[in-house]
Amino acid sequence: MEEIIDVKNPKEVIEYLNNIDVDEYVEIYFGRVHVEGRLMHYNDGLIRLVHEKYGIIEVEIEKILDDLLELVHSNGEKRVVLRFY
C-alpha cells in the first residue's frame, strides 16, 4: 500500500523522521541527489542510513530542507511518500 502526503512545511519532515523505527527503509530526494538505505540512527536532524554497497550515509536534514523534494519511508507493509513540491 502506498500513501502520498503533500507537505507544505518542510520542517514537518523532522517530526516524521522521529517516528521511523531503526532498520526501516528511507529514500531522500533533494536537489539532484538521491540517497537511500536502512535507518541506522536519527537524532536532532542528523540521519544515518546504511546502504548495502556504499556503507553509512549521513545527511543533516536541516541543511537540505530548502532543496528537499521527497522523503520516502517503507516498513515492508506500507510505503509513505512525503512530497515537498
Curated annotation (Swiss-Prot):
Organism: Methanocaldococcus jannaschii (strain ATCC 43067 / DSM 2661 / JAL-1 / JCM 10045 / NBRC 100440) (Methanococcus jannaschii)
Protein name: Uncharacterized protein MJ0540
InterPro entries with a match to the protein in the record: DUF2097
